[in-house]
Amino acid sequence: MTSSMEYESFYHSGVYSVPEMGIYAAWVAPENSFASSQPFVNEKRDVVLLFSGECFADPETRTDLQQKGHQLGQAAGSWLVHLYEEEGDCFFEKLNGLFSGLIIDKRQNKAYLFNDRYGVERIYWHETEDALFFASEAKALLRVLPELREFDQEGVTQFLAFGCTLEGRTLFRGVRLLPTGSVWSFESGDCRKQKYFSPAVWESQPTLTAEAFHSRFQETFKRTLPRYFESGSKIGISLTAGLDSRMIMACLPQAEVEPICYTFSGEKRDTLDMRLAARVAEVCGLKHQILRLGPDFFSDFASHVDRTVYATDGYLGSLGAHEIYFNNRARALSPVRLTGVFGGEILRGVSMFKPIPLAQRLLNPDLAKAVTACARQWSHDGEHPITFAAFREIPEKRFATPAASRSQTSFRTPYLDNEIVALAYQAPEFVPTSIDFTLSLIKANNPSLSKIPTDMGGMGEANWLAATSRRIFSKTVCKLDYLRNEGLPRRLSRFDSLLTELTSALRIAGLHKYLQYRIWFQRELADYVESVLKDVQVRDQSFWDSRFLEHMASEHVTGHKNFVREIDAVVTLEAVERLLFRDLPRDPTWQRNVTATYG
């Protein structure tokens, strides 16, 4: 199982088994990461922890453990096993971070499988009559259980409807996801499946007044942010021109090693993100670098797609091929990537959860009906908006991009800190639609940063008329850039050349969107697109209308229609079938018992 997950040269791995308990486990982790020095054991070596991801604690927690006589090792995660000794079954609800793990308690002849309360760090599982298999990447299960190498029809339907699978389902037949905030215990051959956390706990909190919320948020954010700067190596700050990374920069804690800032960008054009992020870094006295797409991104695009699909178990495909490319370059600057991602979802009600309007002609008739029905069926009406964001949208719809990042760097965001999310539930009703508390935090902690506008025209020193004009201009440019790229409706495709001429003449093309897959699929990557679609047509994969595939390729490459989403769907599922079903080696050396692989 381990070999399927050890696909980077900087990964470390190991195995651990307790045959008398029927446990055979292994782990994979990037070197010098939080989990790279496992297994974590207590002094008597009768409690063992295998871990994936990261967990954050205040210094007081470690001090308290030492005062109680525990010998904490040098490894970043060594304190966890001692916290379990002290807390027992209450251990899991004390954890703060994105993680999954397996505790083997030899004293009780008992084991616990658990994940973070949001389910961002996944555990895939499959149960047979005589064993339970689980792994943090689905490919590890497919490696040893070839009978699972088939698509789950409902999972594929959800994927084509929303770009993700929902409510514990996966792309693979017989493989499920551990529910959010779960702890499964194993004892004497029995498995007890429980949850240690429910969002209802946070939903039941009292609502604060606006003034109290603003004050509490400032105090909480400044107190919790230093956790995310703890590292044995330099921190890399993935900096944009948006509000959420600006809040981080406004409240920068003292660090032993000065962080480095960087911004992802396209080949040549300087985006607003790049220009404004550089100004933010300069105000904070930090170095800033631009990480650009290079010619090798296009010349090696097929391998970038395959690498992305493999690392994310098929949840990110051709439209995300840049993620590992950029994060690999970011790793050269720092193995830890701190971002402002998910701040909008948790604090301001931003949502990207909506159906993908794929052309019905792409799909076979039965699948087209199923996808349409699925898109109509799923709704989050009546659900608390933060519960939906933190426990549904982020671990389901937004899973793939952080997963690609985590394959290269330690991915961190303060906006999923337990204290921040819990506090967000107490915001007055109007706060999630307002940015006032965000602006007040920035102004209070680094007034100079509030004078630099965001990419959407917010903040900055200007009178009301100038500020309003800037916001209107920024939002208009952003919308035009979106239309020029993946957002161009097929019915407006005939205006493609006019839109390109307009944005070029106004010198606004690429100011917001440096990822131009729609255009790349017409030009630099046209040969790749046509080759893959013809290959799929030859194999006649059952999902598609084979007669439409060649037509789709021609229509897109010539610029007559925008089929960028359809191309991505076909390319991604083709790569899943090829990499994870047909070409994935089979591993005969496995035990039919409780088996785990972590990475």
Show where each model-derived region lies.
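ATP-dependent adenylate-handling ligase core
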Residues: G266-N327, G344-L362, W378-D381, Q408-T409, ...
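Adenosyl-5′-phosphate
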Residues: F10-H12, V18-P19, G174-P179, L319, ...
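Glycine-rich phosphate-binding loop signature in dinucleotide/nucleotide-binding domains
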Residues: E230-G232, A330-P335
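Catalytic metal-binding/acid-base residues of hydrolase active sites
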Residues: D244, F342-G343
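Short, hydrophobic/amphipathic alpha-helical packing segments
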Residues: Q218-L225, G320-N327, R331
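Short, glycine/acidic-rich beta->alpha junctions
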Residues: E93-L95, L243-D244, L272, G317-H322, ...
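Cysteine-centered catalytic environments shared across enzyme families
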Residues: M1-D296, H304-V305, V571, E577-L579, ...
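Short glycine-rich phosphate-binding loop at a beta-alpha junction
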Residues: I235-I237, V336-T339
